[in-house]
Amino acid sequence: MKAMAAEEEVDSADAGGGSGWLTGWLPTWCPTSTSHLKEAEEKMLKCVPCTYKKEPVRISNGNSIWTLMFSHNMSSKTPLVLLHGFGGGLGLWALNFEDLSTDRPVYAFDLLGFGRSSRPRFDSDAEEVENQFVESIEEWRCALRLDKMILLGHNLGGFLAAAYSLKYPSRVSHLILVEPWGFPERPDLADQERPIPVWIRALGAALTPFNPLAGLRIAGPFGLSLVQRLRPDFKRKYSSMFEDDTVTEYIYHCNVQTPSGETAFKNMTIPYGWAKRPMLQRIGGLHPDIPVSVIFGARSCIDGNSGTSIQSLRPKSYVKTIAILGAGHYVYADQPEEFNQKVKEICHTVD
């Protein structure tokens, strides 16, 4: 009954996350709701064999962070905290929870503005947006009374994990960046090996006023089939757990709710998906005692040179780059066993 009450609480918190004509229009055109998202998440987590606790962690301004906790009464070990990427949610770690939580507490949460966390209105300034994300992570940590943590972030989560570590270094025992977004600067057109075609630049300019995933919401009742057509790979990645469309349904319902975190992300970017405030310009200021591990997929289309760049910016600090063979951008789902093993090895260097 207690878990059910917690889930009911978060539904009411989500409902207050956005307002206006768009929020009212979305459920009518898009076959989704907070209840649909809750059901989709429960299907994702149904195959996780270990026990866990889930609840909304209250932070400031009436917001809450939807959280999964795998404790196993191992309070002496430094907890591992997982931050998902853009357009994702905590459910996407389903292939990793059991293995990663065998000998230490593991926490995963939906970033503010994503998944089942509150969806507030973010600032339009990139620096302020970043700070809002960072402060939400710090308030979450304080609410759970975690002293220090091993902070792991994928994609946008990697960028935010680095930003948090810069501001609150005393709380981070090890920073693990998994295919992080937002590190390099946007290259000059003259420096690019393959210049961006004119039609792509024109399309990018035309879509500038819109959020990155606006097409899903515009597609309305056809949005789910759109996800299934555009990203059939997600079904394959999780085929060991699910034979149906559980994963694509979860991704769909995560991304057709009020676009709070999505708008925040857009305000942090410049065409074509580059960060306004690249992390490589600042990562050299990270406290020298914080070890950094960078994990990337050997088959990823994302620039895998960030680890080398971080190493050159922190010559006297621990920086290790790890390539996962056979993995693309979604390393943790492409090669979960290898990914889990590497992360556990990193964690064992802490305690």
Swiss-Prot record:
Regulation of protein activity: Acyltransferase activity is inhibited by detergents such as Triton X-100 and 3-[(3-cholamidopropyl)dimethylammonio]-1-propanesulfonate (CHAPS). Acyltransferase activity is inhibited by the presence of magnesium and calcium.
Output one GO MF annotation. carboxylic ester hydrolase activity
- Write out the GO biological process terms: cell differentiation; fatty acid metabolic process; lipid homeostasis; lipid metabolic process; negative regulation of triglyceride storage; phosphatidic acid biosynthetic process; positive regulation of lipid catabolic process; positive regulation of triglyceride catabolic process
UniProt-listed Enzyme Commission number(s): 2.3.1.51
Can you supply one Gene Ontology CC term for this chain's record? nucleoplasm
Q: What induces it?
A: Increased in the early stage of adipocyte differentiation.
Q: Specify whether Repeat is a keyword of the entry.
A: no
Where does the motif HXXXXD motif lie? 329-334
Instruction: Show the SUPFAM superfamilies listed in the entry.
Output: alpha/beta-Hydrolases
Impact when changing residue 132 to P: Exhibits a diffuse cytoplasmic distribution without colocalization to lipid droplets with PLIN and ADPR. Loss of binding to PLIN
Q: Where does this protein reside within or beyond the cell? A: Cytoplasm; Lipid droplet
Query: What superkingdom heads the lineage?
Result: Eukaryota
According to its UniProt record, which reaction does this protein catalyse? a 1-acyl-sn-glycero-3-phosphate + an acyl-CoA = a 1,2-diacyl-sn-glycero-3-phosphate + CoA; 1-(9Z-octadecenoyl)-sn-glycero-3-phosphate + (9Z)-octadecenoyl-CoA = 1,2-di-(9Z-octadecenoyl)-sn-glycero-3-phosphate + CoA; 1-(9Z-octadecenoyl)-sn-glycero-3-phosphate + hexadecanoyl-CoA = 1-(9Z)-octadecenoyl-2-hexadecanoyl-sn-glycero-3-phosphate + CoA; 1-(9Z-octadecenoyl)-sn-glycero-3-phosphate + octadecanoyl-CoA = 1-(9Z-octadecenoyl)-2-octadecanoyl-sn-glycero-3-phosphate + CoA
Q: Where in this chain does the record put each AB hydrolase-1 domain?
A: 79-184
Kindly list the positions at which Phosphoserine occurs in this protein.
Answer: 124
Domain remarks in the entry?
The HXXXXD motif is essential for acyltransferase activity and may constitute the binding site for the phosphate moiety of the glycerol-3-phosphate.
Function recorded in the entry: Coenzyme A-dependent lysophosphatidic acid acyltransferase that catalyzes the transfer of an acyl group on a lysophosphatidic acid. Functions preferentially with 1-oleoyl-lysophosphatidic acid followed by 1-palmitoyl-lysophosphatidic acid, 1-stearoyl-lysophosphatidic acid and 1-arachidonoyl-lysophosphatidic acid as lipid acceptor. Functions preferentially with arachidonoyl-CoA followed by oleoyl-CoA as acyl group donors. Functions in phosphatidic acid biosynthesis. May regulate the cellular storage of triacylglycerol through activation of the phospholipase PNPLA2.
**Which protein, by its recorded name, is this?**
1-acylglycerol-3-phosphate O-acyltransferase ABHD5
Organism the protein comes from: Rattus norvegicus (Rat)
